[in-house]
Regions:
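Short, mixed-charge aromatic SLiMs
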Residues: 46-50, 148-151
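Preference for short coil/turn "hinge" residues that link or interrupt alpha-helices
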Residues: 2, 8-10, 112, 128-131
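C-terminal helix-rich "cap/oligomerization" subdomain common to oxidoreductases
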Residues: 58, 125-166
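NAD(P)-dinucleotide binding in Rossmann-like oxidoreductases
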Residues: 40-48, 57-128, 134-141
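A structural signal for well-ordered alpha-helical scaffolds and beta->alpha junctions
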Residues: 18-22, 119-123, 143-146
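Predominantly a Rossmann-like dinucleotide-binding segment in NAD(P)-dependent oxidoreductases
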Residues: 1-36
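Phosphate/oxyanion-binding loops and surfaces in catalytic or ligand/nucleic-acid-binding neighborhoods
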Residues: 28-31, 85-86, 153-156, 160
Length: 166
């Protein structure tokens, strides 16, 4: 059976790709979103095959997330700000971003690192945290927020993994 949809292996869009989408949303929000609504489609195994999620926090900051295990869509993060927007292609393994000035249309491209080395960067950060004990760069509170959001969504969908207790 395909691991992507295997409920015994925590399969589905939320834990496979949604964690990345919700993580970047949380990193750009000044506080955790509290108003969360969604629609989802179950796969034949009961895992989440597709979902759309709307999030809003107390400061009025909002985000939209679209997840799909089947449709071909770009892995793109688009961050809309007051005076510009930021586009990150191939997120979370991006090596560049484009900032577009909303008034002038001027595009500024920023490049850093290598897509091929992206997982290595994550490992370096984790190794550094373990060796030094300094976890400040890991943003653990954001990770906890993302886990809480994902669990809240799965509860709303009544999508529980085998052996899981709420």
């Amino acid at each position: 059976e395909n691991r992507f949809f295997n409920m015994h292996l925590a399969g589905g869009a939320m834990l496979d790709i949604g964690v990345y989408a919700l993580s970047i949303v949380r990193s750009f929000m000044d506080e955790k979103p509290e108003d969360i609504v969604s629609q989802w489609q179950a796969s034949p195994t009961g895992s989440d095959e597709m979902a759309t999620i709307l999030l809003k926090n107390g400061l009025g900051q909002m985000a939209t997330v679209a997840l799909s295990m089947h449709s071909k869509q770009p892995k793109r993060a688009m961050i809309s700000c007051e005076k510009a927007y930021i586009e990150i292609m191939e997120y979370p393994r991006a090596d560049k971003a484009v900032i577009v000035d909303a008034e002038t249309g001027v595009r500024t491209e920023i490049e850093a690192g290598s897509t091929a080395e992206a997982l290595g960067y994550e490992l370096q950060d984790m190794e550094q945290a373990v060796v030094t004990g300094d976890v400040s760069g890991l943003k653990l509170s954001y990770s906890a927020d993302v886990m809480e959001i994902m669990t809240r969504l799965r509860k709303a969908w009544n999508m529980k993994y085998p052996g899981e207790q709420w």
